[in-house]
Amino acid sequence: MTTEIRRPISRAASTSRSDAWRFASACSTQDPDEFFSTATKDLADNKALCLSCPVITQCLTATLTQESGRYRFGIHGGLTPAQRLALVWEERLHGHRPNLETAQLLVTPRWRYVLYNLSRLTPEAAARRLGEAGIDTDAVTVRLALWWIGRPGNRLRQRVTRKEPETNRLLRLHTPLIRQLRALGATHQDVAAYFGAPEPLVGRAVARLEKADRAALETTEMEMAA
């Protein structure tokens, strides 16, 4: 059974010139509550509608500018709350924002199939392959384009074998990045969004990492005191 969670909103007409794009949006005639549903079918339908929207980039830019804090709701600019949070941490950690024009190019019929076939690679590896094919791009732009076509776009690469536990693999591949994120004040939710990983998995990884750090510190202090 699918549980639906809706956060009701009211539609308000705006006469602001900066908000004029809203009247051209594909969702302007839709029930706004549907864009705050967590039902799987609603998410897929809403993201598909966003991809056909002529003002998807304006919507995403406005939403990223206006959102702050812990609370993000609904589908905006073709992205879920977690995906938009990931973009926030892409910028904080690497100083990179997606190139919206290039992302739109990547989801056109000419490039969409190519992008889809690269979706099992890391965003960095996919960006390199696209560069070889003639598109100069970066990891965060690739992530955005992958999200728009319904692919994961995760920085945590899909597991090839089940022999290695997920927690071990996350720590083996990404301990330095986890440390950087935590040093910048990232919560478990933030780290999970950045990697595209389940929050419980990130919680276990961070707990193990911090436990190891405490043990190392205690050992160092004991050696210095000896």
Residue ranges of model-derived segments:
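Short Lys/Arg-enriched helix C-cap and helix-to-coil transition segments
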Residues: W147-L170, Q180, E210-A226
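Short, charge-enriched, intrinsically disordered boundary segments that mark the beginning
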Residues: T2-S25
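Short, basic interhelical loop/turn and adjoining N-cap
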Residues: L93, Q104, T122-W147, E164-E166, ...
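Short, non-ligating residues that shape and space the ligands of small metal-coordination modules
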Residues: C59
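Short, amphipathic alpha-helical "recognition" segments used to contact nucleic acids or chromatin
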Residues: A103-T122, T167-A186
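Immediate flanking context of iron-sulfur cluster ligation sites
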Residues: R17-P54, T65-S68
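Short Fe-S-cluster ligation motifs
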Residues: A12, W21, H76-T102
